[in-house]
Amino acid sequence: MTIAMAVFRCKSDQEQGELLAWLGGDDGLVKTRVYDGCQGIETLSGPDSVVALYERWESVEHHQAYVGWRMENGLGDLLETWLAAPLEIAYYDETGV
């Protein structure tokens, strides 16, 4: 299993709210949770209009296929309106500690 951390640095609290609304809507995380390889996802919010996704995936390749599918279907355009900086994605392995 792979952990993917996606960090969205929104332009303001308004854009953060719009992103969270989209994530909670019919085109958001409901589709992520049934995408091939997704084993779970949690949404976090932080200071300075940040949203982070803690995602559990079967593999890095599964997550990258998912991100590619999202970008092909218009998410990149939406992110440009909401984000002050490019989307950040990092991958981690669980240590069992």
Residue ranges and their predicted role:
Residues 73-79:
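Anionic, Ser/Thr-rich low-complexity intrinsically disordered regions
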Residues 1-51, 58-70, 84-97:
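Short S/T/G/P-rich N-terminal loop/turn motif that feeds into the first structured element of a domain
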